[in-house]
Amino acid sequence: MVAKKDKYVFAQVIRDVIEFLEIEDDPTPELTPEALAERYTEILQIAVRLVQQFPDVSLDNELPNRPRSWKVLLHHVFQIPKAFLDNEEKSQEYTYELMTESPPEKLKNSSDISNFGEEISNRFILWWKKSRDSDFSKQVPTYFGMTSRHELLERTVWHSTQHIRQLQSLLENLEIKP
């Protein structure tokens, strides 16, 4: 949240913050959808590889200062693109609940989660092949308001990427080279 006196704006969308603070800036994503898709394909493959490295005994560990297990975080890395793809392919609203959905019972260990990640990665690649020439300026509904498909793709990429850094750090804390 960003506040000025008795007014505030939720800082979910950079465009809202820029307008609220009356800053002259263009919040349009700098990378094209094609560049974002290329990077995301790599990022998802890195995530799959990192998840495979987690010992199953560590999955119930809690993140520092956060009531979230490592298992939930590992799943979340792939639930983010799943929510994006559901929005794109099924016209399902991009909700906070969908993005933060808990891992299903069938995902019991690191191998199960990495297999789920591989499925999502392959689904993303197929989606991109079909969508690359579509209109990314089209507005879509999300839990933080209407946003362009381009902005939602960018947000999806950076969100997963931020969690990749967490995975690397957790592996390093276990003295496992990422």
Label every model-predicted segment:
Residues 1-30, 37, 58-103, 139-178:
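Short, contiguous alpha-helical
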Residues 36-53, 104-137, 151-156, 161:
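Acidic/histidine-rich alpha-helical segments that form the ligand environment
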